[in-house]
Amino acid sequence: VFFLTYLHILRGLNYSYLYLPLSWISGLIIFALFIVTAFIGYVLPWGQMSYWGATVITNLLSSIPLLVVWLCGGYTVSDPTIKRFFVLHFILPFVALCIVFIHIFFLHLHGSTNPLGYDTAFKIPFYPNLLTLDVKGFNNIFILFIIQSLFGIIPLSHPDNAIMVNTYVTPIQIVPEWYFLPFYAILKTIPSKTAGLLICFRIITITILTS
């Protein structure tokens, strides 16, 4: 899903969707919701790697007063934390789906950009040409998504997640998922937790301010 999301963002930059602020901002909100939902889903197996991943992230959020106590249900990652994460992981995809419909509405409201860069009276009709291509692409993505969801969860997960949680033993290295690597690199580079969080937040919001 994140591979397709990053491709979609690059396509939007190439086609200058940055100058369609409503479509662009709603897309960035969807991207942020994807990140939060993916992280919460990563924690849900409650294995050794996901537990310590949750510990690291909640420690980062400790720079925001009272947020960690509310999120964890206490002062450490424990059973109330997993219950809160499960509820959020169930709700956030529906929120993202609603914003996807808003995103599509804004796109149809203002129309798409012209990647060819010249004026012409010739228009390619949406039906049946583009609609057929969209349905074909959706079917292909849906098939890949089902295959990954049903058969690829265990092979693509970290072996340490098959180990029962031990709160007294940390993994040799907490390995982030590949789609978190840009944010992980920033947080590793900057010694200050608050500054690292602000820069990660700024990465997502900077394109909102320039749209």
Language-model features, listed with the residues they occupy:
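Membrane-embedded and interfacial regions of multi-pass energy-transducing membrane proteins
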Residues: V1-S211
